[in-house]
Amino acid sequence: MPILEAPEERLRKFKYRGKDASVRRQQRLAVSLELRKAKKDEQALKRRNITTASDPFVQQTNGAKLTLQEIIHGVNASDPEQCFQATQAARKMLSQERNPPLKLMVEAGLIPRLVQLLRSSLHPCLQFEAAWALTNIASGASELTRAVVEGGAIQPLVELLASSHMSVCEQAVWALGNIAGDGAEFRDIVISSNAIPHLLALASSNVPVTFLRNIVWTLSNLCRNKNPCPCDNAVKQMLPVLSHLLQHRDSEVLSDTCWALSYLTDGCDERIGQVVDMGVLPRLVELMTSSELNVLTPSLRTVGNIVTGTDPQTQLAIDAGLLSVLPHLLLHPRSSIQKEAAWALSNVAAGPHQHIQQLIACGALPPLVALLKNGEFKVQKEAVWTVANFTTGGTVDQLVQLVQAGVLEPLINLLDIQDTKMVIIILDVIFFILQAAEKISQKENMCLLIEGLGGIDKIEALQLHENRQVALTALSIIERYFSEEEDAGTLSALLQDHECLTPLTKT
């Protein structure tokens, strides 16, 4: 509680105190994890290829549909034409929009034969159909993807990346993307099978944009997942090409490129540094101004990840123009963008007072206060964290500017919420503001302002809160700043039989 320890000790313990970089870093990661858990990922892990007649290798066959038993018999036939007809029939069943029989095909034992057919170099149309069938099986649940991997599909699929037939090559890319998207285990098997050099060569060649989209999506899945992260050598191979792809004009290519970079920056400072060293920050900030949500979202996520890194890395993002864009994104019509922007801003506010001053100078305070007043609750929470970081790392003059921006009214209004942790944070912010006012002999004026906003009544009511930490925080504020001197011993007496409370952190 504010009154229980020296201000310097409390500031050190509070979230993101600038002098303790290791603690700040751990807590920034905790905030990042919470944000990630709170929202669904916009990028698809896996994609199933639905039947289309536009591909040159898709031959329209006539006659009755084959039964599963006929498919099993035909796929294993030695006659290439019969084998093709059966494999295509299997692929069509696996490509139907509703309830494709993925598990049924696996249980029928088709995977080993489909893997064999991937090496039918004399029959590229057969390779294509087999790769397509495996692509769709791998798009299913993890157990089905595992069946494809354990059936030995990865190595022949990687070999098909060098096929002279573009459709075969593209289908192999798609299949590998689905396998890598299942998780770190299969991602690393794809990487160890030397897929990346082939994918990068394809990405750098003059392929149609539809093909390039699949390549970039597969590369993004090779950047995806942690515990463990993709190996350093793989990242070093991919980064130059990803950096180049950021200049592409196609929104889907840009989207998946940004997603790839967002996965790479969602980790250690060293990996963030590798991305930053590619010089991509100015372009990422530029893409944050895109009107296309599928580009804006991952570019904002990537830059948001970068500012969870070191203070110099955050400064590079600021130098790239981050703070000229964030205030506008705080007012974006989509609450998901507001939340991401507020989260990014909270990490800027978690830095030294120089970063906080740049935040003020860019005009971020008015839209931040607007979010505190009118944003959805999930957005208000991120805005509260931004203010909390601001008050712990800012100078007295900066806290004065925060108050002048009107932050107290919405904070006091939020004291009624049911989120106990948020209430504690808001009470701590109010304490820091009062402490700053005391330092410049403005305690009485600040108390009058809080009283005029209805703050005293709300803080007094919180003394009876069922959560002990809320109650004691409220009591300490009332006793220190709003009570008569003869009541000053109440808090210390109350605490005699109780342990001091743990410092506030976000988990």
Curated annotation (Swiss-Prot):
Coiled coil: none annotated. Disulfide bonds: none annotated. This is Importin subunit alpha-8. The gene is KPNA7. Keywords: Nucleus, Protein transport, Repeat, Transport. ARM repeats lie at residues 99-139, 142-181, 184-224, 227-266, 269-308, 311-350, 353-392, 396-435. Transmembrane segments: none annotated. It comes from Sus scrofa. Residues 1-57 form the IBB domain. One of its GO terms (cellular component) is nucleus. Functions in nuclear protein import.
